[in-house]
UniProtKB/Swiss-Prot annotation:
Protein name: Large ribosomal subunit protein uL24
MF GO annotations: rRNA binding; structural constituent of ribosome
Primary role: One of two assembly initiator proteins, it binds directly to the 5'-end of the 23S rRNA, where it nucleates assembly of the 50S subunit.
Subunit and partners: Part of the 50S ribosomal subunit.
Stored Gene3D superfamilies: 2.30.30.30
Annotated GO CC locations: large ribosomal subunit
GO BP, one annotated term: translation
Amino acid sequence: MRLNSKQPRKQRKFLYNAPLHLRQKMMAAPLSKELREKYKIRNLPVRVGDKVRIMRGDFKGHEGKVVEVDLKRYRIYVEGATLRKTNGTEVFYPIHPSNVMIIELNLDDERRKKIIERRAG
């Protein structure tokens, strides 16, 4: 994920054309103080099932589980952060992962546990 250029247009081009395995890394969010002390890691990529607190925007302060991670649009969808359309249906509000804080990790995946152990040192 090395990008040498400082030019904004090349930074944007990299974001638009990034492959999925690099997009996943760019979907990282900071951990809460308790998790940071426990795992000795500052941030992790957000996954479905993680519990997050929204720190910025209209839904600031809301907490909920991540329902969907949209790598194409660089957005996540959180339970409780919904909008009502004019026809009455509820839709999830897209939130950038930098605007949330992970407060509870989904550790069902063994590979994720190994990643956390490896990064913790």
